[in-house]
Amino acid sequence: MFRPLLALLLAATVGHANYADDAYAATFKLYNSALSGTCSLYRRPAPDTAVYLVTTQHQLEGSKGDYSQLVLREPQPDGSYKRNDFKVVTRINGKPTWVKHPKFDLAVLRLATPPTGTFATLPTSAIANDERLKAAQPSVGSSLLLFTFPHGVESIRQGFPVARQAVFAQPPLLSSETYPTFQADFPATAGDSGGPGVIADPNGKPLIVGMCFQRLNHDEKVTTEMTTTTVKHPLNMGTFIHGRYLLEAIELAAKQ
């Protein structure tokens, strides 16, 4: 039986509500004049005090200039939120400050000096490696949530992401070494790149199973007497990089 997304977010147990809330709170908009995308923030165990911004390589590479804005959300005493655009250095003298994963469309920016103000992060232990993913037992057709800014749209103007519902379109427990990406069924669109996919772990806490990096199309070549063109048919699916590779990229950035 279909249940509205709100019912999923406010599911029967407190644990299930918290897993979505915690991952949602650690998802942020990243933008500049040529960029409007999604990122999430993580922390490694102490003594590392840096914050790690995780997003796609293509978004950072396509950005212009040396700075981007990270849209933080400052809680106010009256229960409202204030938008706080924090300037992030993405290049120094034209050289990227982020670390790219050697194999995938995945980038991590190490913020040695964390942003000012109040903001949420997730511990890297919330990212699924193979062991954590197996313990959670997701299956083909089971649900996951995705938090993004589709076409740059904010659910609330102070920088809140949009919660989207998806299902695993292929078995998620296949070897992530052999199959480093997986597909999920949802109406993927521009701005979803960089969004974390999340399920509940066995303790009801957030488990980041991967990061969305592209929407899936079927390309059809159409040839006429005069021209040949490619028609892209949207398949309403997105492709995710498995969580273990997010962990790899964060560790690479930590060694900078």
Put a short name on every predicted segment.
Residues Y81-S125:
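Hydrophobic alpha-helical segments and helix pairs
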Residues Y19-R83, A112-P114, K134-A136, V167-S176, ...:
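Catalytic histidine site
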Residues P4-T13:
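Sec-dependent N-terminal signal peptides
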Residues D185-C212:
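Catalytic nucleophile loop of clan PA
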Residues L207-Q256:
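C-terminal cap/linker of serine protease catalytic domains
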Residues P114-T118, I156-V162, P171-P180:
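Gly/Ser-enriched beta-turn/beta-hairpin loop segments
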Residues A126-R157:
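Short glycine/Trp-rich loop-beta-loop segment that forms part of the substrate-binding cleft
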Residues M1-P4, V162:
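Positively charged n-region of N-terminal signal peptides that target proteins for export
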